[in-house]
Amino acid sequence: MDERFNKWLLTPVLTLLFVVIMYQYVSPSCTSSCTNFGEQPRAGEAGPPAVPGPARRAQAPPEEWERRPQLPPPPRGPPEGPRGAAAPEEEDEEPGDPREGEEEEEEDEPDPEAPENGSLPRFVPRFNFSLKDLTRFVDFNIKGRDVIVFLHIQKTGGTTFGRHLVKNIRLEQPCSCKAGQKKCTCHRPGKKETWLFSRFSTGWSCGLHADWTELTNCVPAIMEKKDCPRNHSHTRNFYYITMLRDPVSRYLSEWKHVQRGATWKTSLHMCDGRSPTPDELPTCYPGDDWSGVSLREFMDCTYNLANNRQVRMLADLSLVGCYNLTFMNESERNTILLQSAKNNLKNMAFFGLTEFQRKTQFLFERTFNLKFISPFTQFNITRASNVEINEGARQRIEDLNFLDMQLYEYAKDLFQQRYHHTKQLEHQRDRQKRREERRLQREHRDHQWPKEDGAAEGTVTEDYNSQVVRW
């Protein structure tokens, strides 16, 4: 009985051993787990170290990567967000600067929707604008008589933007800029007439940093003199553009510029056919310039033109008696100036914001149907940003520029609404284009398939008939 039982027991044991041996040969990855088959670690004891297989090595902790070759991290491209850089060293320090001679492919251009100064909050419109105010598309006829007029407000990034206009636009006949010359020749294709009125093309033809009041009364006459007499019968469109900047940053930048010796004393300030008298526009300093002026001294001058400069340069000054402060009371004057500046800014063909360089580029390109060669660069470090002021000084600057603060909030809201509206229209056109392409592809396939089916049927019929004849 015992012998028969041992025979029956021996067969399953041998079979089990055979299966275990075969399993070890067939499954090499099981080596580590099968070596201690049947041995379980006691409570509180760590089991034998297992060698991670290829499939589990990716999930292994870092200390188990010793035998795995460490590859260098992949190269990272330029970030889509803010790009800090030192302020460009030039006469007018500006936050944005074109990258000269650098031409990127289309897919490498920075996304204009990406945040430029850190994480931006979700945009919520504050002002109600009509569809006409938000839609900006200019049928700019560069081969005709149309002219772009750049209103350059001090310390708003105008020097950089002006260089973009003469050196960075893709044109049939680019502007000719020679080394050592401050002005470029921007002629229309096949003509010796200029299409751009700016510091770097025509110079300060209407005075140094001429404002809206001066330009609108001066530019038409200047352009008629420069133009050929035979073209005077044709109509001409003037498209005014400008740049705005955060009032506190702009004010500090102007203070630093004046501190280095800038005066702009040759500005004409023409209004109603004359310049202001010394009593109407006194100076803040007795000497040739205001070099070394402190911020407190700069703010204490009540007739400092830096105060509310953006509103004054965009408003129609003839509405308030020009620089004659006795023409009306101060409250009424401020109300009229602010409203006039808002209306003129809204009716301009284009305006950009220094703090949003890429969105400025995007809107300009869509407005005038012109493309820039190199993308705009956002500089976050300027001389103004390096100035450390306390909260009291900042509040004082905001109070001195209370009109500019209101204008900038209005301008920023209009700018953002125009940008989002333009992006939305562009997305709609792209979707419509894709739908049209898919529809054409379907029609093309539908036209091809019946012909192929018909040809196949004809071939079968012909073969059958020929076989019948043969039979």
UniProtKB/Swiss-Prot annotation:
Glycans are attached at residues 117, 128, 231, 324, 329, 380. Residues 462-471 have a biased composition (Polar residues). It is an enzyme of class 2 (transferase). Residues 28-471 are lumenal. Residues 88-114 have a biased composition (Acidic residues). GO terms for biological process: heparan sulfate proteoglycan biosynthetic process. It is found in: Membrane. It catalyses: alpha-D-glucosaminyl-[heparan sulfate](n) + 3'-phosphoadenylyl sulfate = 6-sulfo-alpha-D-glucosaminyl-[heparan sulfate](n) + adenosine 3',5'-bisphosphate + H(+). Its EC number is 2.8.2.-. Residues 39-122, 422-471 are annotated as: Disordered. 3'-phosphoadenylyl sulfate binds at residues 152-160, 245, 253, 377-379, 383-384. GO terms for cellular component: Golgi apparatus; membrane. Residues 70-81 have a biased composition (Pro residues). 6-O-sulfation enzyme which catalyzes the transfer of sulfate from 3'-phosphoadenosine 5'-phosphosulfate (PAPS) to position 6 of the N-sulfoglucosamine residue (GlcNS) of heparan sulfate. PANTHER family: HEPARAN SULFATE 6-O-SULFOTRANSFERASE 3 (PTHR12812), HEPARAN-SULFATE 6-O-SULFOTRANSFERASE 3 (PTHR12812:SF3). This is Heparan-sulfate 6-O-sulfotransferase 3. It comes from Homo sapiens (Human). The lineage of its organism: Eukaryota, Metazoa, Chordata, Craniata, Vertebrata. The gene is HS6ST3.
